[in-house]
């Protein structure tokens, strides 16, 4: 980031620096982010920008789409005994009391999880199979509005947290439409009851009946929902492909700060897109 600030006029203008004036080095930028994290100011900044969007006419409209993605972090090489201590909730200093330098480099907040993906169709037209991919890191849970595609709410958890458990944390009640789209991970009796109680209409994908084939009517209904729900995947693709979202810090507080900053940056890019669209329209 230090190099980009020195190299790009657009970055200098955005940050308010004059051409040729002193600019912050990498260490200064890191310390500034640490201060923001300690003061819990990044979430406040995210909410302030969202309020700015609303006052300029970008209200949360058309319903909301909920999803989560795994944000990778450097893998930890721990023994079985150390893994057990981490799962028991011990801090790094408690797990490695005799080696404080090692403890300072250990992330005990991130978790392993299994990510499922579909294999390519085999030769001869055989059906696809699920591939289990072990992944380590944190999860970025978000809700976007269907009309403009801005991230309206986000929550960061460890990677093993179930997606459906965070529905209530990201769904807001100020959207002008009541519809809520999500994949099957979010469908449960408790989530459905909560949505109904708060005046939301569930557009969550329906699961295949246990022990039965998925009916054509169910497939068709889920396909209709997927056309809208797929928009949230574009958000994650932007963040990972164009913003290089990856956790290199230690601990969930710093991970939350990094992910929230990326979510904020995405909203800024999205605002530029809409403003240009309006100007050319």
Feature-to-residue mapping (PLM):
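Short hydrophobic/aromatic-enriched beta-strand-loop microsegments
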Residues: 198-206
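Basic, amphipathic alpha-helical segments enriched in Lys/Arg and hydrophobic/aromatic residues
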Residues: 193, 218-281
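Short arginine-rich
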Residues: 13-16, 268
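Polybasic low-complexity intrinsically disordered regions
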Residues: 3-7, 15-20, 24-197
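Generic, well-ordered alpha-helical scaffold segments in large soluble proteins
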Residues: 4, 8, 35, 52, ...
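Structured core elements
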Residues: 141-143, 153-155, 181, 203, ...
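Short, charged, surface-exposed secondary-structure boundary motifs
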Residues: 165-166, 190, 211-218
């Amino acid at each position: 980031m230090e190099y980009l600030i020195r190299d790009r006029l657009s970055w200098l203008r955005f940050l308010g620096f004059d051409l040729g004036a002193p600019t912050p080095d990498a260490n200064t930028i890191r310390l500034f982010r640490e201060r923001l994290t300690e003061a819990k100011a990044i979430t406040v900044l995210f909410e302030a920008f969202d309020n700015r969007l609303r006052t300029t006419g970008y209200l949360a409209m058309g319903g909301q789409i909920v999803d989560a993605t795994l944000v990778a972090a450097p893998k930890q090489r721990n023994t079985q005994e150390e893994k057990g201590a981490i799962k028991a909730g011990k801090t790094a200093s408690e797990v490695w009391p005799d080696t404080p330098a090692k403890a300072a480099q250990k992330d005990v907040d991130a978790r392993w999880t299994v990510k499922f993906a579909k294999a390519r169709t085999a030769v001869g037209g055989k059906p696809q199979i699920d591939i289990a991919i072990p992944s380590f890191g944190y999860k970025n849970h978000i809700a976007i509005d269907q009309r403009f595609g801005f991230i309206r709410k986000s929550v960061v958890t460890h990677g093993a947290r179930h997606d459906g458990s965070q529905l209530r944390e990201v769904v807001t009640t100020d959207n002008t439409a009541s519809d809520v789209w999500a994949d099957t991970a979010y469908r449960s009796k408790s989530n459905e009851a909560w949505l109904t109680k708060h005046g939301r209409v569930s557009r969550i994908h329906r699961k295949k009946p246990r022990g039965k084939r998925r009916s054509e009517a169910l497939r068709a209904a889920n396909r209709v929902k997927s056309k809208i729900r797929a928009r949230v995947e574009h958000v994650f693709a932007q963040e990972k492909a164009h913003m290089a979202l990856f956790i290199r810090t230690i601990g969930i507080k710093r991970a939350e700060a990094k992910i929230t900053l990326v979510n904020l940056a995405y909203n800024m890019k999205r605002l530029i897109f809409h403003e240009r669209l309006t100007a050319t329209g």
